[in-house]
Amino acid sequence: MELDAPPQNFRSPAWGWTKATRALTFLVLVFALYLIVGETPATHGAVYDDDGFDAIDDFRGAVLDGGSGKAALTVYECTLDARGCAPGSVRSKQLSRAKADAVAAIRAADLSQLVTTPTPPLSIGLTGGVRAAMARGDLARPDVDRFFASIKRPTRTLKVLSGADEARLERRGGGYCAHAALGVHSDRVGTMGSGGATMQLAAPGDGDVASLSTDLLGIEDRAAATGDEAALREWRDDIDAQLRTVDVHGFEGAELVFAMSMHASAAALAGVDGRRVMRKVADIALQGLVGAASAPGPAWDAVGAPNPYHLDPELLRRATLFNAARTRSVVEALPEGTNFYFARQVGDVSCDWSLGLFLEDAAAAAADRSS
């Protein structure tokens, strides 16, 4: 599924889902919430083939994000220095993004269900949706091993990411993007990221990381049974209880918290993405979005969430509600005085854990080159 670019006068992403079964429909919706369309100059090749880099110094790779109901394939390039990617040299381009069943692809040992195009050397991170399937017993470690062993193209890192892995990689990618956007040193950047099954927090530097279970599909099912108001209370109570187990003191020294993925989607609809905002400003804006999405009517209509695929308005509204409430819970849990920057992309670089994995691969390549 490819999403159309939003109108020029609309800053939020075009996002959508298709109707099939109820559960599959929501997985597609989760994937759509996960996306923000980023424009990449059409004159470039797989990443950039006309940027003037000396070819011997170029490092290229692709990263597959296999998570909750989606597969996103991004290709990256940078210039290597002695430590990895040289500051400011990373470029990225999303090659594909689609509704996909990563669990089925793994069981079938069939990468083509997730990746349909040639790539530079490929790294794969399997995230919350796959972790949940393994925890339920729907997928076993030997299934994953067979899937990885079946891949015929050149590869680098192939891994089921733990929640802590995902949080650390988000911190690495978010630190790079925060420096690119605002000049903030990466060691002073905390991060918050989210998907369909989990959300992650990482304090700056070598601070604590945490991954929390936030099942959007499950809460949508309960909302259909109990109504939005009761489900929203349950959702907030569960998230707040998990957040109380996180030591947020490590964020007190953060110059900035870089908020990515579905948190950035919520901020885009609330009008606080792409700029530095104080905690109170973000909280008020997200509170307004939660209120607007709490019921059909003029307030919700005024949000103007794009719907190019003519989706069921009620489920679109409900998904927005729970995603915004989740983001607001995290914002409220972090220390007063925290500065946030919500974004999926800085310039032409996608900012998420996939970037962090590419940066790690580049650092390993630089170390190999110097040894």
Task: Describe every region a protein language model picked out.
Residues 1-20:
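Short, low-complexity, Lys/Arg-enriched N-terminal segments of secretory-pathway carbohydrate enzymes
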Residues 22-37:
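Hydrophobic membrane-insertion alpha-helices, especially the h-region
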Residues 39-57:
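Ser/Thr/Pro/Gly-rich low-complexity linker/stalk segments immediately outside membranes or between
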Residues 52-68:
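N-terminal module-boundary/linker segments of secreted carbohydrate-active enzymes
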Residues 61, 75, 100-118, 129-191, ...:
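Helical "lid/coupling" subdomains associated with nucleotide-phosphate turnover
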Residues 66-67, 93-100, 122-129, 260-261:
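Short loop/turn segments at strand-loop or loop-helix junctions that form parts
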Residues 69, 197:
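Conserved Rossmann-like nucleotide-cofactor binding loop
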Residues 78-85, 206:
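Short loop/turn segments immediately following beta-strands, especially the blade-tip
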